[in-house]
Every structure is written in C-alpha cells, then in structure tokens.
C-alpha cells in the first residue's frame, strides 16, 4: 500500500516537472520569437533609415559613386524644382560619405523660349545635361545619354552662340516597328561624334536612368546599392514584357524604362549600338545589353519598383499601393501627386524614428503601425 503511494507521488512529481519544463520552454520560445520578429521588423524598417549613426558608420566601408540621371523635358521646370529640393535633402542626410550627382537629362529645346528657360535654370543650379538630339522618348535619347559616359565626350555648350540656332521639334515613334533606323545627333564644334569617343569612363559605380514622373526613395536606393559596389556588367530594374514585340525579340529580359541602373560597361554596350531596332526605349536598352552576351549581374525587382495605383486609372500588373521599402514609384504626373507621395515617406520615416526611442515590447507595435495612405485624388 505504502509502495503504491510512493509510486503515485513520484508520478505526480514527474508530471508536474514535465509540465513546468514544457511551460518554460514555450515561454522561452515565445520570447525568442518576439525577439526575432522585432529584429526582422527593425531590419526591414529601421536600417538604415532610423539607426542613422550605425548606417553612416557602415557607409564608410563601402562608399559608392552614383550618377542619377532624371529624364525630363525643358517645359517641366516645376517638376525639376520639386525633385531637386527633395533629393538634395536626402543626399545630404543619407549619402554623407558617397558621391551622388543628380542631373536632369534634356533633349534639344523646341523653341527660343525653352532655350532661354533652360539657360536661366542652368545658371542657377548647374544640374542640366542637354543632349545633342531632339527631345524624344523612344527615338534614341537613352542611347545618346549613355554615350556621355565615354572617354572624350564633351558636354553640350548650352551658352554658346552656336546653340542659338539649334532649335528642333521633338521626335517620336508612333507604334510602328523600326528595325534599323540610325540615330542622328547634332554635335556642335568642340564636341566629338560617337565614333570618335573612347572606352567607358569609370567615374561612377552606377548610372541611373529614371523618369521625372517617378519618385525615388533614395535612402532605400542607397542601402540597396551598398550590396553591389564593385560589380561589373550590372543591370538592375523591374523586368518588363511587351506583347507588342515581335516573337523574335520578345523573350529577352529588359527593365521597365521608368527606372533602371547600369554599370559603366553596360552603358557602353547600349551606346555603341546606334541603330534602333525596337521602338520602345526600355526594350531597346535591354536588347542591346542582351546582345552583349555575359550579363553576370542582372538583378530583377518587382515589389519595390512599381506604378502607383490611382483612382480611375485602370489596373496593370505593375501597380501597387505605397510601401516603405519602395525604391521607385511611377506615374506621378502632377506636382501635388509628387508632393503627396514624398510627404508620406517623410512621415513614415519620422514615425519610425520615434519608435526607436521606445522599449522593445512597445517598439514592435509601433513599427507595425503605418501612416494612413493619403488621398490620391490629385
């Protein structure tokens, strides 16, 4: 009888011990899961945006040189003024140890008023790059842009008297396929034509082509570029497809034209092919890179490069709502819309900066919160 009682007591103690151990194990796992969750959210949202000192200290290890070419037109003065102010603020704060040169890329002016406007703007800011080609989207502007990164290229002499008479209407293709049309450029005396230019210059690690109706989330862009410093044959963007392309060229990969990045050697591959094969700028760029052969560092991104979902604009597979990890948000055709998107990102960064001052248990909930999406009826 006594022996059975001892067995029962031992069994109860054993069960209690196992239960206690299991409970402790579950609690410990829960705490570890919360720590991992917090670390994940911090990595996603805080670095490098909030932990600025740590981020900038890390930036000392891998400084980069970036040419940020924003494709614009002479008439888009207000858009350039907005982007110039906004981007320079981010560059001063988040690229302290890096080189970031912002330039607005223009074709030739269409009339004397445009010439006077861009001359005054250049006197004030000095950040315009005029190309010796009529203003266009798909008729060779990008190809000529990339030739500016070759040895021997001389900038267009905007203030020369010779430029007074170089007024040309914009040119566009209208949907028909152009299988072999040569680019015609209008170099002024002192400028070399393409065939007289040399090898790629390596003044920059990265060369960006972006449209002025896109907002670039520069802190996120800078963070991403740190991972690719020193890479050659680099091509980054959102992969696109066009059903309009003929079957023979439909399957090669290319990046959507509103934002992509190349290394200097890839810029040369685009610039040296002077004949337009495909009447879509982004597809022509991708095709030239494809023909070059070994593109060993092609990086495709979908979620961080997108068209903004807007009211009454229909839907396409490239669209998304605003998200903090975006690199480029496209289809911002008005200054109020650009301003709305820019302000949303600034408020999100401010909110997450405030989160960093909280204790860990409160910080997670703070980071999971988001600033309400703004009204986009602008």
Curated annotation (Swiss-Prot):
One of its GO terms (cellular component) is Golgi cisterna membrane. It is found in: Endoplasmic reticulum membrane; Golgi apparatus, Golgi stack membrane. Residues 30-378 are lumenal. Keywords: Cell wall biogenesis/degradation, Endoplasmic reticulum, Glycoprotein, Glycosyltransferase, Golgi apparatus, Meiosis, Membrane, Signal-anchor, Transferase, Transmembrane, Transmembrane helix. It catalyses: 3-O-(beta-D-galactosyl-(1->4)-beta-D-xylosyl)-L-seryl-[protein] + UDP-alpha-D-galactose = 3-O-(beta-D-galactosyl-(1->3)-beta-D-galactosyl-(1->4)-beta-D-xylosyl)-L-seryl-[protein] + UDP + H(+). Glycans are attached at residues 53, 97, 180, 354. Its main location: endoplasmic reticulum. Residues 1-8 are cytoplasmic. InterPro entries: Glyco_trans_31 (IPR002659). It is a single-pass type II membrane protein. GO terms for biological process: 4,6-pyruvylated galactose residue biosynthetic process; cell wall organization; meiotic cell cycle; protein glycosylation. Signal peptide: none annotated. One of its GO terms (molecular function) is galactosylxylosylprotein 3-beta-galactosyltransferase activity. Its EC number is 2.4.1.134. It comes from the Eukaryota. Belongs to the glycosyltransferase 31 family. Involved in cell wall biogenesis. Has a role in the addition of Gal-beta1,3 moeities to galactomannans and their subsequent pyruvylation. Has a role in meiosis. This is Beta-1,3-galactosyltransferase pvg3. It comes from Schizosaccharomyces pombe (strain 972 / ATCC 24843). The lineage of its organism: Eukaryota, Fungi, Dikarya, Ascomycota, Taphrinomycotina. The gene is pvg3.
């Amino acid at each position: 009888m006594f022996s059975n009682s001892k067995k029962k007591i031992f069994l109860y103690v054993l069960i209690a011990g196992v239960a206690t151990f299991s409970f402790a194990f579950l609690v410990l796992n829960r705490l570890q899961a919360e720590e991992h969750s917090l670390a994940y959210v911090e990595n996603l949202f805080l670095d490098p945006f909030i932990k600025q000192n740590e981020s900038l200290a890390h930036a000392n290890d891998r400084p980069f040189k970036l040419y940020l070419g924003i494709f614009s037109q002479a008439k888009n003065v207000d858009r350039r003024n907005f982007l110039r102010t906004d981007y320079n603020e981010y560059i001063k704060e988040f690229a302290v140890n890096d080189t970031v040169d912002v330039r607005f890329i223009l074709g030739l002016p269409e009339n004397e008023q445009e010439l006077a406007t861009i001359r005054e703007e250049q006197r004030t800011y000095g950040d315009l790059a005029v190309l010796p080609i009529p203003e266009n989207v798909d008729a060779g502007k990008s190809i000529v842009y990339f030739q500016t990164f070759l040895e021997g290229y001389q900038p267009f002499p905007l203030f020369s008297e010779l430029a007074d008479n170089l007024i040309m209407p914009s040119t566009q293709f209208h949907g028909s396929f152009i299988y072999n049309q040569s680019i015609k450029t209008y170099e002024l005396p002192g400028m070399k034509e393409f065939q007289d230019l040399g090898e790629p210059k390596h003044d920059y690690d990265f060369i960006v082509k972006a449209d002025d109706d896109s907002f670039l989330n520069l802190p996120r862009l800078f963070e991403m570029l740190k991972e690719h410093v020193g890479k050659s044959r680099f091509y980054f963007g959102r992969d696109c497809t066009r059903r309009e392309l003929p079957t023979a060229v439909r399957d090669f990969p290319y990046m959507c034209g509103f934002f992509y990045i190349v290394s200097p050697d890839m810029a040369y591959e685009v610039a040296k092919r002077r004949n337009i094969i495909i009447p879509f700028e982004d597809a022509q760029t991708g095709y030239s890179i494809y023909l070059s052969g070994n593109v060993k560092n092609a990086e495709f991104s979908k979620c961080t490069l997108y068209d903004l979902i807007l009211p009454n604009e229909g839907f396409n597979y490239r669209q998304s709502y605003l998200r903090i990890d975006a690199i480029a948000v496209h289809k911002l055709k008005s200054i109020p819309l650009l301003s709305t998107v820019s302000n949303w990102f600034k408020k999100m960064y401010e909110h997450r900066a405030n989160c960093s001052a909280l204790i860990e248990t409160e910080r997670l909930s703070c980071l999971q919160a988001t600033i309400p999406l703004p009204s986009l009826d602008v």
